Amino acid sequence: MNKDIMKCFIGKVIRIDRGGPESRIGMLLDASDNLIVLLTEEDGVVYFKTSHIKSFTDNMKEQMEFNIKVPKDFKFKKAANFQDLLDTLKLKWIQINRGGPEKLEGVLCEVNKDFVFLVNNGEIVRLSMSHIKSISYGVKIEKAKSKK
């Protein structure tokens, strides 16, 4: 995905991919060299590695449901690239990938150019950087409450 094209959609609701465990609908918050930042209802802030994004869909007819009111002072981690993002998340509880057999959770304890090291339940998991599609780390916004 081209960073300059993605920057045109910041603040808009888009869908990442057409289906599958990594597909998400949310508001695009930022776009950098090889990552985008999406605020989703399910997972909060999710950082997607652009090399794994197959498509994105613009919400032109506003048919994609997104019921989160984003505060003006909402803060999230920004990074120039995916490696820099991972460096800022050391010693934090993260989730790698959204679902399926590739989903992992744990404390990010080490990052290098080839692998990340997660600790979870007494195990150290070494995961190849090439298999990381997305990361989230716990920043969430409550859904806007509808009046009944």
Q: What residue ranges belong to the model's regions?
A:
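Short glycine-rich, low-complexity segments
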Residues: M1-E105, C109-K148
